Every structure is written in structure tokens, then in C-alpha cells.
Amino acid sequence: MKIDRIELYHVAIPLPGPFYPAWIPGYPQTVNRFTLLRLTTDDGVQGLAAGVAFENEREGLGGLIGPYLIGMDPTDIPLIHQRLREVSYLGWRNFWIEAACWDIRGKVEGKPVWALLGGREGGRAEVYASTGEVHPPEQRAEEVLRLREMGFRTVKLRVHSFDPAEDIAQVAAVRRAVGDSMALGVDANQGWRVALIDDAPLWDLDRALHFAGACADHDVGWIEEPLDMYAYDELAELASRSKVPIAGGELNGGWQEFKVMLEKGSYDIYQPDATMGGGITDTLKVLKACGERGLAYTPHT
């Protein structure tokens, strides 16, 4: 079995109204975009994978790395992973393509991918509601109460204000509103510092420590991406001094970056993304390493 054809589709789903993501200040998002990949083998088996859009760069992806993949056995995941890592210098990290090969392997063996990975049937995982925009404290509290009515028992808040007191006020307002009926997490979105405005609220270690102290007073379960994703040493100091678990890693790419973070103790909770963080192969390495160290692992999606 060999890869015979690579096809890319740029998907754009209009949103009902402008959405202002906390992770890109100043950006009014009106369309949800992603790139869909379809691999077809010489036997006619197809595998699908989806990654972030970047249409202009993806446009030439097939011609750029196609020659590196065409003719390869898609079920030889280790070799596919190695090839994707080798060609990463040609453009954006394309580890997300690996998922299509897992899809093909699952179809060939007649098993879902979770079974190929050693998962067990019948398990349950509680989901949490994740807010996406930064809203004033009282508005956020009302939104969280509605989420509780929908059945959610955990919610993740977004804090990305210029005034640190405003971020703390949001957490306090939500905790007052829900009491102890919900668990709270907070995402500062400091890992990826992209903005479409001249200025953006960027955190340093002092601000992160101050915020972590306030979160401890309001029984927050975790603080996500409180510093730049490459600030390994500062993150390690924060994790060692904070009473609230520090989480992150969704934007880091490849096992080598996670290996450094694990050695330094940058996080209490590791959140690799299989489409960006080295594919399923490397995220499994992170899972194993977290298990050996007694650390939490919650993959980003």
C-alpha cells in the first residue's frame, strides 16, 4: 500500500456574527477556516486530517511536500512522522498530516484510532465550557450561569485585559455567582502573542505571580498559558511558586520542546495539540512522560 494522491480543501464556515478571540486582540473573526487533507492510497483507501487554515501557504503544500510523501506506506507511522519532521523547514509545521495516516491504518485494520492507541471502550470524559472572548466581569458571570443551566460543571474563563485588576475582578465575579457549584479554569492566552492592534496586554512573571495568588483565593483549578510559550525558565519558576496548577503547551511543536519543558518543570498540566505539537506520535510521548512524572495531561483540541 502506498500514498497515491494528496488533496487539500480550504473550508470556510461563516459565523452568525463577529467573534473577537481573546488570543488575537483586535481581530473581528467572521469566518471559521480550516484546511482539510485527503490522502488516497493506490488501493483506494482514504484518510482524512484537518489543520489550521493558512490558505496561502497551504495552497502549494501538495506540490511542496507531496514528493516527500507520494509512494510511502501510510501505515508506517514512524517513518511518516520522521519524514514530516524532516520537511518542516519547508514551511509551517505539518504534523497534522500524520492523522490522515492513522485514519488509513485504522480502516485497514478495521479499528478506530483510539483502539490503535490502546484506549479502552466505555470510558467517559467530562467536558467543560470554554469562553472565547474577553467580557466585563458581570457580563461574564451571567454567561457562566447560563452555561451552568445547560449542564456544564466546569468553565474556562478568558483574561486578557490591560488592567490586571479587571482580570481578577472577572474571576471573583464568576466565583461569587456560581459559589462552589462549578469548577473554574482561566486562560490568559499569553503563549501566542499575535495582535492586530498596536498594543496588547502582555504578561511578565510578576503579573502572572500576582494573578496566580488571586486565583488561589477563588479556588481556580488551573491557569493556562500565563507566559510566552518559550519562556521555559519563567514558567518553571511560576509553577514552583503558584498554588494553582499551571497549564500550557498547545502551541509548542515536537517532542524536543516538550522534553525541555518537562526537564525544567515548566508546567503542572501539559496540553500538547496533535495537529501542531508533533502529531499523535509526539503527543503520545508527552503522555507517557507525564505519567512517569505524575503530571497531568489534557491534550488541546
Predicted regions and their residues:
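Structured beta-strand/loop patches that form or line metal/cofactor-binding pockets in enzymes
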Residues: 1-46
